[in-house]
């Protein structure tokens, strides 16, 4: 049975630990609940000394949720992507309800990197990142972590671990533990924007 992807369905899925991915443009959407689940411990995220120097230089202007559609489309703009047009349209609708978020790195008035995700209670579900200038997405990620820490978020879900995320000390936890953390985080009255 095919189900239409809606913002309401997305939010319900996230509260249960599921997220969607498409198999290429125009392809069917599948729902995932990985075990183990990749998350960041917000008080243990690691940033290299080199990256911290780049951040201190304030080379990038950081903006929050001002160019959500441009960010998600930039994340999808690669030879192989799980971000279908249906996913893009639905997440844009989710953004308009206040749950879809982006963190953007701008350089000389141009969007050069960033990430997008979903905030729900005290949980942030990171979806994807893109980078057109060296360090732009890493700087956006740093500012995401700082914002989540400062606003009392308890969970930064990154779904799957990969080589890029290892440098920031991503950890994998069993599904049961993830569900417990998710339940606690969802109960928090946090606001991203």
UniProtKB/Swiss-Prot annotation:
InterPro entries: Acyl_CoA_acyltransferase (IPR016181), Leu/Phe-tRNA_Trfase (IPR004616), Leu/Phe-tRNA_Trfase_C (IPR042203), Leu/Phe-tRNA_Trfase_N (IPR042221). The keyword Transferase applies. Gene3D superfamilies: Leucyl/phenylalanyl-tRNA-protein transferase, C-terminal domain, Leucyl/phenylalanyl-tRNA-protein transferase, N-terminal domain. Its EC number is 2.3.2.6. Keywords: Acyltransferase, Cytoplasm, Transferase. It holds the Pfam family Leu_Phe_trans. GO terms for cellular component: cytoplasm. It catalyses: N-terminal L-lysyl-[protein] + L-leucyl-tRNA(Leu) = N-terminal L-leucyl-L-lysyl-[protein] + tRNA(Leu) + H(+); N-terminal L-arginyl-[protein] + L-leucyl-tRNA(Leu) = N-terminal L-leucyl-L-arginyl-[protein] + tRNA(Leu) + H(+); L-phenylalanyl-tRNA(Phe) + an N-terminal L-alpha-aminoacyl-[protein] = an N-terminal L-phenylalanyl-L-alpha-aminoacyl-[protein] + tRNA(Phe). GO terms for molecular function: leucyl-tRNA--protein transferase activity. GO terms for biological process: protein catabolic process. It is found in: Cytoplasm. It comes from the Bacteria. Belongs to the L/F-transferase family. Functions in the N-end rule pathway of protein degradation where it conjugates Leu, Phe and, less efficiently, Met from aminoacyl-tRNAs to the N-termini of proteins containing an N-terminal arginine or lysine. This is Leucyl/phenylalanyl-tRNA--protein transferase. It comes from Gloeobacter violaceus (strain ATCC 29082 / PCC 7421).
